[in-house]
UniProtKB/Swiss-Prot annotation:
Residues the record lists as Phosphothreonine modifications: T47
Subcellular location(s) of the protein: Nucleus
Region feature (Disordered): 1-37, 200-220, 234-277, 292-343
Principal subcellular localisation of the protein: nucleus
Modified residues (N-acetylmethionine): M1
This protein's name: Coiled-coil domain-containing protein 97
Pfam families: CCD97-like_C
Biased composition (Basic and acidic residues): 262-277
Compositional bias segments (type: Acidic residues): 241-261, 324-343
Length: 343
């Protein structure tokens, strides 16, 4: 009886450790897999599985850098329910570390778009498997892509973001564009506004009449906020004017201007455009603001949310054709913004 019991115990695997069969995709054969935690919280609180004792500190640092790079990307680490709070970076790294050590092939397949060529050393222990070799080769191809290809991808993403912002309406509203480029706005639009248009642009605090229901047309708090924003805008305008004057002075030192040029400059200052010409000026101003965004010159905009976001790669056929025509026919600095439909 003791011999039978001993043989039975020898056949039973240890609890919390499963020996995967060769049919388990993404798992290494003969590799014990720790029992999975019940949920994401336990995974985040659990200590990541350590590498073998003979693994060097440099390799540990490389794996840690790779995990943090994937966690910092916009790739979803795990599925979450609606309304569930976002995972912290520590939680993401813990979940990624568990998947990396338990199922490195699954990790490589799922997060290969967030990997860089220097991260491939972290998957040397699975090389030789045709799936690992395929995904590693794909990561390597991405890293050795031609500069023109990378530049085109970046422009495609910014172009897709531009279309979204145009459709949203707020980012390229007169108010927002004037705040970002006050001097450019003044040159194309502001100096030609009528007194009525200037009055309509400046809200005033109008308390409700006695006995009349309702709230004031412009609450005092909003008026104070707009007054502060206007002062900040005027400071930007003054700074941009000083920068432009400095550039003009340098150009005047290099080129001599005759009286005829000065006379033509005075005539241009006295020119007052009609309604059709004002519309053309507005379109040109908007086009330059679009190009300014594409060139990465909007200092207050976080371009990493676009340049590093693969979601903006999903352009429809019409937008892709328009983008190719836009960038192939014109130089980046001089190209006007394309006319976009409002679909």
């Amino acid at each position: 009886m003791e011999a039978v019991a001993t043989a039975t115990a020898a056949k039973e695997p240890d609890k919390g450790c499963i020996e995967p069969g060769p049919g388990h995709w993404g798992e290494l054969s003969r590799t014990p897999v720790p029992s999975k935690p019940q949920d994401k919280v336990e995974a985040a609180e659990a200590t990541p599985v350590a590498l073998d004792s003979d693994t060097s500190g440099a390799e540990n640092a490389a794996v840690s850098a790779m995990l943090h790079a994937v966690a910092a990307s916009r790739l979803p680490v795990c599925s979450q329910q609606q309304g569930e709070p976002d995972l912290t970076e520590h939680e993401k790294v813990a979940i990624l570390a568990q998947l990396y050590h338990e199922k490195p092939l699954v990790f490589l397949e799922r997060f290969r778009t967030g990997l860089r060529e220097e991260h491939l050393a972290c998957f040397g222990h699975v090389r030789g498997d045709h799936r690992a070799d395929f995904y590693c080769a794909e990561v390597a191809r991405q890293g050795t892509a031609r500069p023109r290809t990378l530049r085109t991808r970046l422009r495609n993403r910014r172009y897709a973001a531009l279309r979204e912002l145009i459709q949203g309406g707020e980012y390229f509203s007169d108010e927002q564009m004037r705040f970002r480029a006050p001097l450019l706005y003044e040159q194309y639009i502001g100096q030609y506004l009528t007194q009525e248009e200037l009055s309509a642009r400046t809200p005033t605090h109008q308390p409700p009449k006695p006995g009349s229901p309702g709230r004031p047309a412009c609450p005092l708090s909003n008026l104070l906020l707009q007054s502060y924003e206007e002062r900040e805008l005027q400071q930007r305008l003054l700074q941009q004017q000083e920068e432009e004057e400095a550039c003009l002075e340098e150009e005047e030192e290099e080129e001599d201007s005759d009286e005829e040029d000065q006379r033509s400059g005075k005539d241009s200052e006295a020119w007052v455009p009609d309604s059709e010409e004002r519309l053309i000026l507005r379109e040109e101003f908007t086009s330059r603001m679009h190009q300014r965004f594409l060139d990465g010159k909007d200092g207050d905009f976080d371009y990493s949310t676009v340049d590093d976001n693969p979601d903006f790669d999903n352009l429809d056929i019409v937008a892709r054709d328009e983008e190719e025509r836009y960038f192939d026919e014109e130089e980046p600095e001089d190209a006007p913004s394309p006319e976009l439909d409002g679909d």
